[in-house]
Amino acid sequence: MLKKKKTEVYALGEHISMSADKARRVIDQIRGRSYEETLMILELMPYRACYPILKLVYSAAANASYNMGSSEANLVISKAEVNGGTTVKKLKPRARGRSFPIKRSTCHITIVMKDISLNDEYVKMNSLKKTRWKKKSTAMTYHDMYNSGGLWDKK
């Protein structure tokens, strides 16, 4: 029996004092990219959300090297999500005894990294299995999209 080896590690940052929408703007740029490419993108982007996300990416890579012994060159961000956290509500005193509410939003950021070198071994093992539903023959048809024989082809 083959024991399935763990291929994913994650880093979780909770109660980061930032709007979830502002953090999502940065997370959408790095989702699905490699570790080195992610570091370059995060260091060059001019947003405040980049620094806590960069710390989480470093932490996830350290988790991968410590827990699985994998190299940083083989890591890919497979899943990155931002969820809204708690909202800190305060009152700001104003003139004439009034007060205005202040809402300070927080977010939770989760970054999941996958080691693609371990994933290739499973692809090799699964390719040895015989597929039963594979089609016998596939015929390719070529369609000329520039010369469709319509009205506009005639001069």
From Swiss-Prot:
Alphabetical GO biological process terms: translation
Q: Which PROSITE patterns match?
A: RIBOSOMAL_L22
CDD domains found in the cross-reference section: Ribosomal_L22
Q: What are the protein's UniProt keywords?
A: Chloroplast, Plastid, Ribonucleoprotein, Ribosomal protein, RNA-binding, rRNA-binding
Give the CC-aspect GO terms. chloroplast; large ribosomal subunit
InterPro entries per the record? Ribosomal_uL22, Ribosomal_uL22_bac/chlpt-type, Ribosomal_uL22_bac/org-type, Ribosomal_uL22_CS, Ribosomal_uL22_sf
Q: Where in the cell is it found?
A: Plastid, Chloroplast
* Coiled coil start-end: none
Q: Which GO terms describe its molecular function?
A: rRNA binding; structural constituent of ribosome
Q: Which Pfam families match?
A: Ribosomal_L22
Give the family this protein belongs to, as stated in its UniProt record.
Answer: Belongs to the universal ribosomal protein uL22 family.
PANTHER family named in the record: CHLOROPLAST 50S RIBOSOMAL PROTEIN L22-RELATED, LARGE RIBOSOMAL SUBUNIT PROTEIN UL22M
Q: What does this protein do?
A: This protein binds specifically to 23S rRNA.
Binding partners and assembly: Part of the 50S ribosomal subunit.
**What is the protein's given name?**
Large ribosomal subunit protein uL22c
- Lineage per the UniProt record: Eukaryota, Viridiplantae, Streptophyta, Embryophyta, Tracheophyta
